[in-house]
Amino acid sequence: MKTGFGVASAVLGAVVFCHAASAESFRLAEIQPKDRHTTKYTCATGRVLQVTYWNTANGQSFALVPVKGQQLLFVNTLSASGVKYQAGSYTWWTKGPRADLYDAMNGEDAPPVLSDCVTIIR
């Protein structure tokens, strides 16, 4: 599991740079993207989030999630239910059309920082 965090830390700067340079590009020579999609969510607070997901040829998945004014690269990790992505102390946990954002710095039993984020369907 630490390897996933190491990869996320190592490529975070490159991905943020790539994202800033072009919202369409996500290029790392070592990791070949298979598909990409962007989903908009409306959270219980009324905040709207735009999250971009990548699935890669090697089976990894990434999510680019806006947190405190920055785009953070999250890497998928083991989950008993749904898909869980982690970046530093943050966890972005999706289950079907819903998602929650947690910050481990707030404590193990703390409520989500953003909760009940639901996919906007057009």
Walk through the language-model features, giving the residues of each:
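Mid-chain, structured segments of secreted extracytoplasmic proteins
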Residues: 68-106
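Positively charged n-region of N-terminal signal peptides that target proteins for export
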Residues: 1-4
